[in-house]
Amino acid sequence: MIIPKRYAEALFQLAKEREKINEITQSFNQLIERLRSNEEVFKLLSYPVVDIAEKKQVADELTADLEQEIRDYLKVLIDNKRTDELAEIHDTFLDLVRTEENRTLCEVKTPIPLDEDELKKIQDLLAQMSEGEVEIETTTDESIIGGIVVRIGDRVFDYSLKGQLNSLREQLKKTTITS
């Protein structure tokens, strides 16, 4: 985690100095999305036996329409053999951006997708809880059966049916043991 954090901090400082945090963040997000949707390209960029010149050529094609800073940054990662850590670097970079902009990431897990109205209500409630702007990342997980699980930083609020059933099971175990 130390090395990816250093790379993320370096890019963040560059974005801040050039007053291009939004543009660089958007380009970095696009790069990550492209790599996630094309696993073969990611493998090629990460595989140590592939020639660096070939990796840079692929990187140029992949990032041709992105900010120059991201294009150069990817080449530095290729030179330093750190492309396999891109996802972790990206997550850390986004954390730095959120901190700078006083935004909190809230991960919301529900058994079914939320509609716009439900999402807005949850966002308003979470904004009150975190005393600031929130960025919601939603996922669906049918195993929670019903309800909602919210993660804000290192705090988890489990209001799911699965969580309640697990809690009840633990209470019953304790009752059985002490009886």
Swiss-Prot record:
Where it mainly occurs, coarsely classed, is: membrane
Q: Which Gene3D superfamilies match?
A: N-terminal domain of the delta subunit of the F1F0-ATP synthase
What InterPro entries does the record tag this protein with? Answer: ATP_synth_OSCP/delta_N_sf, ATPase_OSCP/d_CS, ATPase_OSCP/dsu
Q: Does the keyword Amino-acid biosynthesis apply?
A: no
| Bilayer disposition of the protein | Peripheral membrane protein
User: What Gene Ontology molecular-function terms does this entry list?
Assistant: proton-transporting ATP synthase activity, rotational mechanism
List the subcellular locations.
Answer: Cell membrane
Q: Out of the domains of life, which is the source? A: Bacteria
Q: Which UniProt keywords apply?
A: ATP synthesis, Cell membrane, CF(1), Hydrogen ion transport, Ion transport, Membrane, Transport
GO CC terms of this entry: plasma membrane; proton-transporting ATP synthase complex
Does the keyword section mention Cell division?
A: no
SUPFAM superfamilies in alphabetical order: N-terminal domain of the delta subunit of the F1F0-ATP synthase (SSF47928), V-type ATPase subunit E-like (SSF160527)
Q: Extract the HAMAP family matched here.
A: ATP_synth_delta_bact
Kindly state the subunit structure of this protein.
Answer: F-type ATPases have 2 components, F(1) - the catalytic core - and F(0) - the membrane proton channel. F(1) has five subunits: alpha(3), beta(3), gamma(1), delta(1), epsilon(1). F(0) has three main subunits: a(1), b(2) and c(10-14). The alpha and beta chains form an alternating ring which encloses part of the gamma chain. F(1) is attached to F(0) by a central stalk formed by the gamma and epsilon chains, while a peripheral stalk is formed by the delta and b chains.
Q: What does this protein do?
A: F(1)F(0) ATP synthase produces ATP from ADP in the presence of a proton or sodium gradient. F-type ATPases consist of two structural domains, F(1) containing the extramembraneous catalytic core and F(0) containing the membrane proton channel, linked together by a central stalk and a peripheral stalk. During catalysis, ATP synthesis in the catalytic domain of F(1) is coupled via a rotary mechanism of the central stalk subunits to proton translocation. This protein is part of the stalk that links CF(0) to CF(1). It either transmits conformational changes from CF(0) to CF(1) or is implicated in proton conduction.
Name the family the entry cites.
Answer: Belongs to the ATPase delta chain family.
- Provide the protein name: ATP synthase subunit delta
